[in-house]
Regions:
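Terminal, compositionally biased segments used for targeting/anchoring and flexible tails
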Residues: 5-16, 26, 68, 83-85, ...
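Short, surface-exposed polybasic-aromatic patches that bind anionic ligands, especially phosphate groups
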Residues: 15-18, 22, 32
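Acidic, low-complexity/disordered tracts enriched in E/D and polar residues
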Residues: 23-27, 43
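Short, hydrophobic/amphipathic alpha-helical patches that form generic packing surfaces
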Residues: 34-44, 75-86, 153-161
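Short, amphipathic alpha-helical interface elements at domain boundaries
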Residues: 34-39, 44-46, 57, 169, ...
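Amphipathic, hydrophobic secondary-structure cores in small proteins
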Residues: 51-58
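Compact alpha-helical subdomains of small soluble proteins
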Residues: 55, 63-75, 79-94
């Protein structure tokens, strides 16, 4: 049974937001890349400290005002720091102590070159007006990390000190994500276009097929969808912005945005047109 929009949980934005989709490319700030890396490492097969579902549970328990106020990766920091405390890996007192040390030593300062402003490119906490797809950038020009950004740094330091993560692992994870992107997806598509056998293997087992090209299948099931003249596929995650990171890297800002996650479900044809894809009326769209 379909719920009325006002009855949907805060985090499930399907169909509830009509703003335009901001397609402006944005380069992640270092603290965002680091939060992304820490979250993935803590949940990997080596450590298995928590699951994606547990991380979602903590974030989805936030009240609506807080949920939409926090930038995407600050919600991630809230999620993994809360779970580390819940599971007894870290204690609140030691986090507070480390945060105080960081402030005392000046390590709570934003380290950007003069005149550079990084953006919360993955804001999906848009206000409810159609002409404002992203909240105004709130760290451009500031000099101090926000409380959750500082907590992320404190978590990192404590995990490294205890040997749960290493600085090298975090750096390698960031570099791995930096190296992935649309160019790798294009390699897969071109190979499928030019090699019917590979296309068949890609359809049957996308993870194994991309490994033929030296790419990673990742730790989740990778699936390839094939467009035809009759059916065009549009992929969206209305809950947590799931994305084929093992090939494409970090999801772009527009994919995580509140506008895309809401409108792709309700108006897929309009969303595709906004990205420059005009489909014949006879082509079905599968979301």
């Amino acid at each position: 049974m379909t719920q009325k929009p006002e009855e949907l949980p805060t985090h499930d934005v399907a169909g509830r937001f009509a703003a335009p989709i901001d397609q402006t490319p944005h380069e992640p700030a270092h603290w965002e890349k680091e939060a992304d890396a820490i979250r993935l490492l803590l949940a990997d097969k080596k450590r298995q400290i928590f699951t994606t579902d547990e991380s979602r549970r903590v974030q989805e328990a936030l009240d609506a005002e807080t949920y939409w106020k926090l930038p995407y990766y600050e919600r991630w920091i809230h999620g993994f720091s809360s779970l580390l405390k819940e599971k007894g890996v870290l204690q609140e007192a030691e986090l507070v102590t480390e945060e105080a040390r960081l402030r005392a030593t000046g390590e709570d300062k934003v380290e950007d070159p003069p005149g550079h402003h990084h953006h919360h490119h993955d804001h999906d906490h848009d206000h409810d007006h159609d002409d404002h797809p992203y909240q105004e950038d709130d760290d451009a020009g500031i000099a101090v990390l926000s409380p959750l950004q500082l907590r992320g740094r404190a978590v990192r330091n404590l995990l490294v000190a205890r040997g749960i993560l290493s600085a090298e692992e975090i750096r390698a994870q960031i570099e791995a994500m930096d190296s992935r992107g649309e160019h790798l997806g294009a390699r897969v598509v071109v190979r499928a276009w030019t090699d019917a056998g590979f296309a068949a293997r890609l359809a049957a087992d996308a993870g194994a097929a991309v490994e033929e090209l030296g790419l990673s299948r990742g730790e989740t099931v990778l699936t390839a969808l094939f467009n035809t003249p009759a059916v065009h596929n549009l992929v969206v995650c209305t809950l947590c912005s799931c994305y084929p990171r093992s090939v494409l890297g970090r999801p772009p800002a527009w994919y995580k945005s509140r506008a895309y996650r809401a409108r792709a479900v309700r108006d897929p044809r309009g969303v595709l047109a906004e990205f420059g894809t005009q489909l014949p009326e006879g082509t079905s769209i599968r979301v």
